[in-house]
């Protein structure tokens, strides 16, 4: 929940001053998301300084208490549902896919994509149980690394591949939509279309505030 920065500024200090409760393990996450008295929740590692989740493939027993993206996402959904029962908007990012692209690491790139896929499944399962008009949109703001796979590979064998850069590319990215008004997502062609898609189906914030 929330991101980090690497310029020496410790985000958790300002968040605590603003009334946020910082949860850094599974136990605190469960307790914090269930506590009705907590109105602002964050999950930052290393004080918000390069506080990324460990890559899935690099997790060791030392990191077994660190929640994964699926757990953080479901906790955030439950937290918001409890406090805003009439509706809310949330952005969930599988940022480690991007990081693996920058480092041209095929192993982490594939595994983090799988982890994000697992998160999308969990979010969809949660949404299906809610009696609400829910829209789930899955896309990316860009591709990273210029990854290209070459030919077929046997099951269990990493594919032959090349990278063209360590930065973002202009490669097209997919858009998937599920739920309420999902058919309107077919018109999305540019990044800015995502904004207009939600603007047209989500009530203004003033209306949501009044409902909640």
Positions of PLM-derived features:
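A post-motif C-terminal structural segment
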Residues: 1-212
């Amino acid at each position: 929940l929330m991101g980090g920065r690497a310029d020496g500024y410790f985000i958790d200090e300002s968040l605590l001053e603003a009334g946020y409760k910082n949860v850094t393990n599974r136990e605190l996450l469960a307790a914090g998301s269930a506590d009705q008295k907590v109105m602002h929740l964050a999950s930052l590692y290393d004080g918000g300084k390069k506080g990324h989740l460990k890559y899935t493939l690099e997790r060791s027993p030392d990191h077994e208490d660190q929640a994964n993206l699926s757990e953080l996402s479901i906790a955030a959904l439950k937290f918001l549902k409890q406090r805003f029962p009439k509706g809310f908007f949330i952005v969930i990012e599988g940022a480690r896919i991007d990081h693996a692209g920058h480092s041209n690491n095929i192993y982490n790139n594939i595994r983090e994509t799988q982890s994000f896929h697992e998160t999308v499944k969990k979010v969809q399962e949660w949404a299906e149980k809610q009696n609400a008009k829910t829209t789930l949109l899955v896309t990316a703001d860009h591709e990273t690394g210029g990854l290209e796979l070459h030919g077929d590979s046997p099951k269990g064998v990493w594919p032959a591949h090349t990278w063209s850069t360590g930065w973002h590319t202009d490669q097209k990215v997919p858009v998937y939509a599920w739920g309420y008004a999902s058919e309107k997502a077919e018109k999305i062609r540019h990044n800015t279309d995502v904004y207009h898609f939600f603007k047209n189906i989500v009530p203004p914030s003033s209306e949501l505030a009044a409902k909640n």
